[in-house]
Amino acid sequence: TICDTMDFWISGKRKALEATLFKVDILIIYDCAARQLSNEYNLAKAGQYILDLGPRAAVIKRGEHGATLVTRDSYFAVPAFPVLTVTDPTGAGDSFAGGFVGYLAREGDTSDTGLKRAMIRGSVMASFNVEDFSVRRLEMLENHEIESRLESFMEMLRF
């Protein structure tokens, strides 16, 4: 089970949120919300706090700085895919989450390696989102564009 939360639930329905997190496998959360939930500025500590609430993994979205996957045994940070023209960042985090969850649903691989691959997919999907307003770019997106950007991103990350 995957959950995405925000400050509204943290400040307004904290007990219900914590009860929900106990039943969740993966929490996807923005960095500011992770800090609010944990009362920790350090995101590594915030991630560990989240794991103590029940999830086996936390995905902390960090906006233009990418995202971090936190598990009991590891941390994995993925940068945001570099985009030359950012038109509107609204919804990029949701597009990241959609790419992440979509990859896991399609592949069925929730191992640490599978989660890392899902992080890469999420970053790529978010990069398309910021290229236009609303969901326009995503609506006209073709699979070969995704695959091409994934290949480019993997090459950037290799050294």
State what each model feature region is:
Residues L43-F159:
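Conserved phosphate-binding/catalytic region of the ribokinase-like
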Residues T1-Y49, R56, G66:
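Conserved beta-alpha-beta core of the PfkB/ribokinase-like small-molecule kinase fold
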